[in-house]
Amino acid sequence: NNSLQDNHLTIKLSGSAGQSLGAFATRGLKLEVSGDANDYVGKGLSGGMIVVRPALASRLVAAQNTIIGNTVLYGATAGYLFAAGRAGERFAVRNSGAHVVIEGCGSNGCEYMTGGVAVILGSIGANFGAGMTGGMGYLYDPDGVATSRLNMETLVSCPVAVPHWQGQLKELIESHAAETDSERASNILQNWDLELSKFIQICPKEMLNKLIHPLGVEATSIPAE
C-alpha cells in the first residue's frame, strides 16, 4: 500500500537470512538484518527499505567480506537497500528504480539496469554495467582500477563534478552510514572533499541527452573501445 509512511512497520532480524529477503517489499516496510543474507535480496523491491549489517559481535572487516548474495535487487522498481559489506555477482541486475549502497560486488554488476541509483564503496568485478540502459552508478575507486572492469559498449565514465550529482551521492552515503554504522562510509564522509575525487560516475550513453542535470564533463568520458 503506497499510502503508508516510510518505516511504518520495522522488522528486526538477526542471523543469516535465506533467499529473497524483502522480495516485493512495499513502501512502509523496513527490514533490518544484523548478520547476513543469501541470494535475491530485495527481488522486485517496490518501495520498502532493507538494511543489512554485520552482527555487533562480528570482528570481520565489513568492506572486505560478502554480506549479501547474488542477484540482489533483481527487477526492483523502488525503495532502498543499504548493506555494510560486499554483494555477490549480478548485483542490481534489471534494477529499474531502487537506490542502493553496498561496499563492493562481484562480476556483472548493474547488468541490464534501467533505472535507480547504485553506489558501490568498494571494488567491482568484471563486466560491470553490461546492457545498462538507465539509472546512475557511483564507484569508489581510490586505486584507479574500476574503469578496466566496466563494459564500455554502452557506458560513459567521468568524475563526479556537478553539484547535483555530488549531492545525490553524498546523501546516499550519509543514509548508508546512519542505517548501517558503516565504518567505510563514515571515513569517506569525514574526509569528503578529498574522498569525492576518488569516485567515478557511470551513466549509459543513451541517457546523456535525457538528463535534467548534465554530467558536465562528457568530453572527458571514457570512449567505447
Task: Specify the residue positions occupied by each region the protein language model found.
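Long, distal/terminal scaffolding or interaction modules
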Residues: 1-225
